From Swiss-Prot:
This is Geranylgeranyl pyrophosphate synthase. The gene is GGS. PANTHER family: GERANYLGERANYL PYROPHOSPHATE SYNTHASE (PTHR12001:SF44). Dimethylallyl diphosphate binds at residues 117, 196, 229, 236, 246, 256. Geranylgeranyl pyrophosphate synthase; part of the gene cluster that mediates the biosynthesis of aphidicolin, a specific inhibitor of eukaryotic DNA synthesis and DNA polymerase alpha. The geranylgeranyl pyrophosphate synthase GGS is required for supplying a sufficient amount of geranylgeranyl diphosphate (GGDP), the general precursor of diterpenes. The diterpene synthase ACS then catalyzes the conversion of geranylgeranyl diphosphate to aphidicolan-16-beta-ol via the intermediate syn-copalyldiphosphate (syn-CDP). It is an enzyme of class 2 (transferase). It comes from Neocamarosporium betae (Beet black rot fungus). Keywords: Magnesium, Metal-binding, Transferase.
Amino acid sequence: MAYTVEPREHSKNTTLPTVAMPPSPPSSFSASFGPFRYDTKEVNFDHWTSTKEKVVTGPYDYIAAKPGKEVRTLLLACFDEWLQVPPESLEVIGQVVRMLHTASLLIDDIQDNSELRRGKPVAQNIFGTALTINSANYVYFLALEKLNSLKNPNITDIFTEELLRLHRGQAMDLYWRDTLTCPTEEEYFEMVANMTGGLFWLMYRMMNAESSMPIDLLPVVELLGVIFQVLDDYKNLCSREYGKLKGFGEDLTEGKFSFPVIHSIRSNPEDLQLLHVLQQKSSNEHVKLYAIEIMESTGSLEYTKHVVENIVSQIQEIIYSTDEGQGRGKGILDLLHKITRLS
């Protein structure tokens, strides 16, 4: 059976009905209510205040309020013995490096599921993960904004290149942890040269760009990034002071392939116990002490000490040959002596 649609009969009156417009508000009507408050000629949408700014920077300010050992600030002064950067530029670079370092700690603590930072609860456990991530990202851009005051066209490129380097290194560290993949020592050194060395490179390259007497110390900068991370890995397992600030053996709880762990696993690949400990991500102190016993049995902690000594020797050799007796490397050598006391 076929269906047909009858055409609708149109009204002879095709005039559209008149729509009544709302009356204008009376003079007593508050400008804060009603649709008329959105008259863009009257409304100012830029109401950012210092109170709102504190909301954004709260997690960052929380960590920054209790500074660490300020090693990067000390290193800034060491590099300046060589580069003699103008004081105004040096101040900006120092502020930017501190901002980036502190902001990166906020992200690190989330990625590592940490509990303590500098002896205090981590920021995400106070402010929440989402606001903490936002705060860290915000400070990255505040740092970039601050660099614009240097009026140096090369600075932005340096900033971008070194933050890319840092995130590449961080990605590999996280990938190995999350896939339970033990890297080689060479892969580890490449990773830390990027991850830990990224901010060192950033600091040095910006100072070099602002200096009237630039000098090539990049091999020293790269080795400094490596030695700082190897030392951090060792102290995480063996330092009581470190344990009070970050928690005992936190790298084991995180499941991280730190330098002593890598050496131990590769020294005895048939023994899977240490891999299983990393997989469990245990916070049990007895389990972590047992893992350290395994590393001691493979000589991994002593091996780590020897590697540190070897890197120190390499840095000393480069500095002596570059300095030519002028004494500009004294600051770096003194700092190395201070931070490498492991016993």
